Amino acid sequence: MVHYAHSRDIDVEDAINAEQVDDQIARVVNPLALAFERSADLGATFRALMADMLRQFLGTHKSIRLLMKNREENPSAVADAMSLTREQIEKVYVVALLLENPEQWTERYLKDEWRKAYERHLLDVDERSGLTRYDDFLKEHADGLENERKGLGISDEEKEFVEWRYRNPPGTPRPPHLKAASKTIANFPMPAEVIDEVSDPQLKDALRRWQREYGYFSGYSHSGFRKLMPGFMEGNMRLTTSEKEKVVETEYAQSIMISYLATGIACTEAATRALPRGPSGGAPASKVADADLLVKVSDLWDLLDRTSLVGRALYEMRMRHVLPPKFGAP
């Protein structure tokens, strides 16, 4: 199922105070990130990565709010706010995959980052090795990447595969001895691929529904016509100021709500997932969040369910099944 058929509407007069919601979101994200950092029986790299990822939702959201706030000075910036919202949507898939298998996907995530850095280094060598002022930089960068490679446990074959892929155009037959390396240092999965890796059928459905938002907002990151619309509106003198503001309210202001939803989904999955503990996950699984924090997450969804149809769809499809029940709920 990739949609939710609504039988209850929201109250369109039930407006939100964005500053208050920002504060409510922060009171969920910050203690949850801290809870990961303090969970010493989780892998050190995984818990640090999760804490940073959760906090980044707040950082990106602040940028979205700033772009929307300054739209009178820079009308085209509202389209950039939508591009950042797409980033928020995508981070949900990263969080979901990291939680699916912390050890496996943390390693893959870090290998993917090293691969990108190494490919960039190879390009720098190709383009700048003839410039004397880059001699020291290229050598020091190569040494740093090599030390990082060894620290991450990236094999010689994986390094060779990155070099081979960099040197050869797509479609070039891969050397047989690099077959295994091509899988272990492959790109970190995109959202559609993440869905295939998720084991929980209910979460799969919610992520499929969420992918509809990802596809729509991707039009802003891929320079579709919607990205150009703010400039078009500014140059179209037939639109009144109130008509332009109506477009902002119906199209671009949703960037703020979708950003709230992205943060809410990620925090819900991170707070409610029972994670394997101890060396190699040998200890009983347990949640990172305590009861008080779970109540805060549930209170956040009470707001998101009440004020957004997208939020209500996601709440009914997934969140209500993993969060503490609302008071008086059926």
Where are these regions (language model features)?
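Secondary-shell segments that build the walls of catalytic and ion/ligand-binding clefts
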Residues: 1-48, 115-330
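Long, hydrophobic/aromatic-enriched structural stretches that serve as scaffold segments
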Residues: 35-100
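Long, hydrophobic, well-ordered secondary-structure blocks that form the structural core
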Residues: 75-132
